[in-house]
Amino acid sequence: MTKPDAATRSLVVEREMPHPAEKIWRALTQGPLIEEWLMKNDFQPVVGHRFNFRAEPMPQWNGVTDCEALVVEPHERLSYSWNASGEQAATGPRTVVTWTLTPTKTGTLVRMEQSGFRPEDQGFYQGATYGWRRMVGDLEQVVARLD
């Protein structure tokens, strides 16, 4: 795992959800559910599993994110690398996404941190800030309709 240095920055999105951690964990770790709130994927909650998130390409992004599961602690913590792919792999961002689930009196505090943004990743940081805020909201909608 790459540790961010002092020159990097992190993006944090937190939201308290009125749902148990077990339910949120399902939406964070089951491929078809992940696709509903994030992107197409071949994720497996197994440390060392390499996988991709896939979306429609956009300017400055080929639509593929290369990842590896780094930490899988059921119902508590999930962490994976989040790296540029293809031609962008050499110069694009190499970050780590960590989800932390903390029980509260009324549900679960969901914390998403994407760490390791370098100064030259400012555009990616801004895009991630917008994207994660929206996607955490989408995650909550998926969780709300689970049994």
Whereabouts are the PLM-identified features?
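Hydrophobic ligand-binding cavity/cleft-lining segments
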Residues: M1-N41
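Short beta-edge strand/loop motif at the mouth of beta-sheet-based domains
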Residues: V12-V13, G31-V64, R77
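Hydrophobic/aromatic beta-strand elements that line small-molecule binding cavities or substrate pockets
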Residues: R15, T65-V71, T95-T102
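A short, structured loop/turn motif at beta-sheet edges
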Residues: A21, L70-R77, T100-L109
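Hydrophobic pocket/interface hotspot
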Residues: I24, I34, F51-F53, A69, ...
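Mid-chain, well-packed structural core segment of small domains
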Residues: R77-W99
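Short, solvent-exposed aromatic-acidic interface loops
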Residues: N83-E87, E113-E120
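A conserved amphipathic terminal alpha-helix motif
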Residues: G116-D147
